[in-house]
Amino acid sequence: LLPALAKAKAAGQRASCLNNLHQIGLAVQMYAEDYEGKIPRGNNVLWFLVYMPYMPQGGTDRDFRSVKIYRCPSYPNKKQVICYVDSSWSFRSTRDNIGFEINDPTPLENFQRPTETIYIADNEDGPWRGIVTGLRDEDIRRHDVWHPSHISSSKQTDPTHGRRVSNKRHNGGPNVLHYAGNADWMKADQMTVDMWREKWK
């Protein structure tokens, strides 16, 4: 009975997390409509701050800590208020498999496969990601993915170039949000660099 209850609880948390990402996806689309089709990426503009006015709950006092949608119910440390990472990853060409960090807004129309390309995902808990409790926290800007070692299939764990997308949050994989606004679950070892590109090979 207990294993069955644990499995049911995990399934419920996974569904709740997916719903969070769906809601964030709606906010992304509404924000883009108001800002010439562009969305924030990187550290110049913090995504979880600019999307607050478009959220159906919380954020009315301009405090991102009140937006429950930003919290994955399966995140191990319940004090964490931002449980997702966004993509600030860009590439010089389709042959570039390393890429670089971008900190400028990006037009949604730049993404050739918006239903398949990842924008936001479950973030890994670990030494790279401290608990964020306020805007002055040292780790407030550690919320993005911009290197192959950051994705869920990576085995690296150091603070800077270690895995930033969870590899086991929900039954062996993360939930992810795509640029088109659709969200789904995927196996950690199936995540590839190409899934983060503006232009696919």
Across the structure, where does each feature detected by a protein language model lie?
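Amphipathic alpha-helical segments typified by the pilin-like N-terminal helix
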Residues: L1-N19
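Short, well-structured segments within or immediately adjacent to enzyme catalytic domains
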Residues: A15-K201
